[in-house]
Amino acid sequence: MKPIIAIVGRPNVGKSTLFNRLVGRRKAMVDDMPGVTRDRNYAEVNRFDVPFILVDTGGFEPETSDRLLQQMREQSRFAMDEADLILFIMDARGGLTPADRDVVDMLRRINKPVFYIINKVDGEKQEAEAGDFYSLGVDHIHTISAEHNRGVGDLMDEVLAAIPYDREKELDEEITRIAVVGRPNVGKSTLVNRLLGYERVVANPTAGTTRDAVDTRFTVNKKPYLLIDTAGIRRKGKTVQKVEKYSVMDALRSIERADVVLIVLNAEEGVTEQDSKIAGYAYEAGRGCIFVVNKWDTLAKDNSSIAKFTEEIRRNFKYLPFAPILFVSAETGQRTGKIIAEVDQVMEQYCKRVTTGELNRVFTQAVDENHAPLSAGRRVKFYFATQVAVKPPSFVVFTNCPEGIHFSYERYIMNRFREAFGFNGTPLKLIFRGRDKKDA
C-alpha cells in the first residue's frame, strides 16, 4: 500500500493550491470562497520514483457551530487517522490564530510525522512577518508559497525522506474504476458512504454539497476498486457559479476515467431530461452502465411499481437497453449490497473476448436469416467479423459496402451478438470496413 500524506489546515490557507502543485494538474478546485474543498480529495503522486497518495481535506475549524464546517472538521480528523504523514498548513497573510494553536496542540498528541508549513510567504518581507508562528514551539517550520512554487521543492525533499515506503510491497494491481454520476442531490454521496461503510463524502441536504470528484480506494473480498463520487451535473442554465462549472467538467472527466458508471436516479422525481443527458455522456464514452434508482424506500409501492419504473427507464433511455437496473435506498441500505456484485458482472462483460470462430458462427447465421438491405441498388456482401478490442467490446466487420449499412441493421447485428454472448451492462462498438484487395 502506498503511504498516505494528508494536507490539513483552516479554510482558505492554500491547501488545494499545494495539492495541485504536487499533483501537477488542477484536481482540487481552487477558489477564494471558504470551504470550496469540502471532502477529502485523493490523488496518486509519483515524485522522484517515490509513489504516495496525497489527500486534500476540507478546512479544519476546531470549534464551529456551522454544520457543514463541523462535517468538514470530522473529515479532516478522519484523514489524519488514515495518513502516514501530515502536512499542516497555516496562512502567513492571515497570521497565527487561536484555531492554529488548537490544531497544533492536537497534532502534538498524534504519533505521526507532522510538517508545520506557513504558506503564502512570497518573499523576504513575508518571511520576516511570519515570526509569530515560531512561538508555537514546534521543532521546525517550513515557509513556502504554493502559488509561486517557492520553497515547495525543499519541503518535498524532506517529506519524501520521512515517509515510509517499501517498494517490494507495492503491487501493480488491476482495479475496477467506478464513477457515481447523477443530478445534484439524488443521493450519490449517501450511496458512496453506504458502499464504503463510513462517511467518506460530506452528505448534506443542500444540492451541490459534493463539489469535487472524490476518489476512494476500497476492497471487497480482496478485490480492489476505485470509487469516484462525482459532483452533481446540473443543467447548463443552473451552472451559475464558476465553481459549479468546474464540477460539471470534473464529472465528465470522471466518466472518462471509469470502467463502470453508476447512473443514480431519484425515485421520488422519476426520470428527467437531465438524467437522459447524463446517461448519454456515459454511453457516448463507451462505459459499462448500471442504473441505480435511489430513495426507493420513500415511495408508496404496489406489486407493479418496479415494472412501471423499469418501463419508464427503458422508454427514456432507449440507447441503454442493456444496462441493469437496481432499486435501492442508500439511506437505509436496502439492496445496496447488490451493487458491487452487479459491477463485477458488468466489468466481466466489459472485458469479454469472443473467439473469431464463435463470432463468425453467430454472425453468419444472423446474416443468413436477415439479409442487409440493398445499398444504392447494390447487394451488400459480408466476408467475416473479428473482435479487435475490449472496454468496450469492439468488432470489425469486413464488407464490400462499408458506407451502405443502415443503422437499423447495425443494431440488429449487435442484438444478435448480445443474444449469443451476453454483454450485459456494456455498450458494443461495431465498425464496418472495406476489405483490401490483397485479402480478396
UniProtKB/Swiss-Prot annotation:
Residues 352-436 form the KH-like domain. Coiled coil: none annotated. Residues 3-167, 176-351 form the EngA-type G domain. One of its GO terms (biological process) is ribosome biogenesis. It comes from the Bacteria. Belongs to the TRAFAC class TrmE-Era-EngA-EngB-Septin-like GTPase superfamily. EngA (Der) GTPase family. Associates with the 50S ribosomal subunit. This is GTPase Der. The gene is der.
